[in-house]
Amino acid sequence: MGNRKRPGRPISGVIVIDKPAGDSSNGVLQRVKRLFFANKAGHTGSLDPLATGVLPVCFGDATKFSQFLLDSDKEYVSTFRFGEVTDTADSDGEVLESIDASKLTKADVLKAIKAYIGDIDQVPPMYSALKRNGQPLYKLARQGIEVEREPRPVTVYEFELLAFRPGAVAEADVRVFCSKGTYIRSLASDIGADLELGGHVAKLRRTQAGPFTIDQSITIEELEQERGERLAEVLDHHLLPTDIAVADFPSLELDDNSAFYFSRGQAVMDSRVYRLGDEGDKVRVFDSSGKFYGVAEITDEGTVAPKRLVSQS
């Protein structure tokens, strides 16, 4: 038997969804995929069900570049709640301990936050998708099993206190700009532990993921309303071009002859590559007409070697 053809349209591009609270990232992905009647789609990094905000969804060729988005920096706006410890480190979990936080001040929070700016080693929460012996940690946590987790290096570039509301259960609104793999829930619980009050995430909104911002996003409800009973093609004007997924990489325009060989998986020589980056750096590759061919890596021989290629029709 031959390969079964995927149902749906062979579209390519990216759309930035404003994920609603309460939905899983995969659930949102499947709804968007159905709305566009796409044959291939994937998201670029899960958000907790409690979280809202930027969830880039890639279609077709754009899925080949999703790993680059997974590796990108992120920005979040969150509300940390002090005086309560939960089993999930967010407000979806069960409160395990309550401590009077009425003496907590804004100055205390500012001082605690400052200790987490820069390169830090962070212990991931048990309620996470990280795996131990092939099993997600959150599944172990649901069974009441807690295992030791190794600290992982992450970077918090910016950590800003936006507002502070004192009380027996105090709240702090914060903005965090951080590297991939940073758990905002761990920041909340770790800072709460430092303050000897306990802490968890009450609200979480991702406002940026790589080159994508919340201003570029659209809700599922808006897409559903626009499509109505019409064909999926009416939504295609929302699609961003495939190469925007790697917009942070410098671009290189090849002549038609070099583009031909590059599109067939061959490394090609170009004297301009070292002006774009160093050995191992990535570049976006286009032909002379501006057509996107994929992502290449600069080699020590002055060539660009294909890493991810888009389909050429």
UniProtKB/Swiss-Prot annotation:
Database matches in InterPro entries: PsdUridine_synth_cat_dom_sf, PsdUridine_synth_N, PUA-like_sf, PUA_sf, tRNA_psdUridine_synth_TruB, tRNA_sdUridine_synth_fam1_C, TruB_C
Pfam families per UniProt: TruB-C_2, TruB_C_2, TruB_N
Catalytic machinery residues: D48 (nucleophile)
Keyword terms, alphabetized: Isomerase, tRNA processing
Keyword Membrane among record annotations: no
GO MF annotation terms: RNA binding; tRNA pseudouridine(55) synthase activity
E.C. number: 5.4.99.25
Catalysed conversion reaction: uridine(55) in tRNA = pseudouridine(55) in tRNA
Superkingdom, natural source: Bacteria
GO biological-process terms attached to the record: mRNA pseudouridine synthesis; tRNA pseudouridine synthesis
Role summary: Responsible for synthesis of pseudouridine from uracil-55 in the psi GC loop of transfer RNAs.
HAMAP family membership: TruB_bact (MF_01080)
Record PANTHER family: PSEUDOURIDYLATE SYNTHASE TRUB1 (PTHR13767:SF2), TRNA-PSEUDOURIDINE SYNTHASE (PTHR13767)
Record-stated family: Belongs to the pseudouridine synthase TruB family. Type 1 subfamily.
Name this protein carries in UniProt: tRNA pseudouridine synthase B
Organism name: Saccharophagus degradans (strain 2-40 / ATCC 43961 / DSM 17024)
